[in-house]
A protein has these predicted regions:
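Active-site neighborhood of phospho(di)ester-bond hydrolases with catalytic His/Asp-centered motifs
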Residues: 18-22, 35-38, 57-65, 84-92, ...
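Active-site-adjacent loop/helix micro-motif of nuclease/hydrolase catalytic cores
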Residues: 29, 68-70
């Protein structure tokens, strides 16, 4: 993780699952610029390990607390991997960030699932 914690990539029953845990582009505006730039590079380095990997189901942070840089981690993830289904996480109940992201990135509408409430159930 670029913060604290772990991320998981596993294969089960011929499917690949990725759970980012706390691996994200943690670009906090109150941190020094050198720290923020380092976080971007660390995140890219970790995500590049999965370059072009076909991932069937992914769980990736889309954290509104990051404000204007909230999209950065998911953008980098989508550019470097080939996920089939992505569930944004770390939304802190502010699920409208998913719609906002998709309005900015319509090319991902088929892959990123809309979450409307906690406990929502999906069939994949």
């Amino acid at each position: 993780s670029t913060d604290e914690g772990v991320a998981f990539l596993l294969e089960y029953d011929n499917k690949v699952y990725y759970h980012a845990g706390d691996l994200n582009c943690w670009y906090w505006k109150e941190e020094p610029k050198s720290y923020r730039n380092n976080m971007i590079q660390l995140y890219i380095r970790e995500i590049q390990k999965m370059d072009n990997l076909k991932i069937d189901v992914a769980f990736v942070p889309l954290d509104p607390r990051l404000e204007e840089t909230a999209y950065k981690g998911l953008e980098i993830f989508m550019e470097h991997t080939n996920p089939q289904i992505v569930f944004p996480m770390h939304c802190w109940g502010k699920y409208d960030i998913i719609s906002s992201f998709l309005n900015t990135h319509p090319e991902y509408k088929e892959k990123i699932r809309m979450i409307n409430n906690e406990g929502q159930i999906f069939n994949v």
